[in-house]
Amino acid sequence: MGDVEKGKKIFVQKCAQCHTVEKGGKHKTGXNLHGLFGRKTGQAAGFSYTDANKNKGITWGEDTLMEYLENPKKYIPGTKMIFAGIKKKGERADLIAYLKKATNE
C-alpha cells in the first residue's frame, strides 16, 4: 500500500486541477471522485461522461486504478481525460492510497 501523504501531494500536483474528492464536491473538467472505490466507470451523478467511460463496465478499486492511472487512454480508449498517466508504480500506489482515504471521508 502507498503513502497517503505522498499521494496527497501527487493529487494536488497532477489531479486537483480537474478533480475534487470531498463529499458534495463539484465537478470540474473531471468528475468529483468521492465514492470512487466500488463504483462502476462513468457513474458519478451529474457528470457528462463519454460513452467509452460509461460502457467500460469495470468497478474502480486498487487494481483497476493501478492499471488505469498508468495510461488512461489505453485503458479506456475514448475517455476525455487528457492526462498522460503516471508511469512510476510507487507514485500510483501513493495516489491510490490517498484516493482511498480522501474519497471515502
UniProtKB/Swiss-Prot annotation:
Binds 1 heme c group covalently per subunit. Heme c binds at C15, C18, H19, M81. InterPro entries: Cyt_c-like_dom, Cyt_c-like_dom_sf, Cyt_c_1A/1B. One of its GO terms (molecular function) is metal ion binding. The modification N6-succinyllysine is found at K56, K73. Keywords: Acetylation, Apoptosis, Electron transport, Heme, Iron, Metal-binding, Mitochondrion, Phosphoprotein, Respiratory chain, Transport. One of its GO terms (cellular component) is mitochondrial intermembrane space. It is found in: Mitochondrion intermembrane space. It holds the Pfam family Cytochrom_C. The modification N6-acetyllysine is found at K73, K100. The modification N-acetylglycine is found at G2. GO terms for biological process: apoptotic process. The modification Phosphotyrosine is found at Y49, Y98. The keyword Iron applies. Belongs to the cytochrome c family. Electron carrier protein. The oxidized form of the cytochrome c heme group can accept an electron from the heme group of the cytochrome c1 subunit of cytochrome reductase. Cytochrome c then transfers this electron to the cytochrome oxidase complex, the final protein carrier in the mitochondrial electron-transport chain. This is Cytochrome c. It comes from Cephalopachus bancanus (Western tarsier). The gene is CYCS.
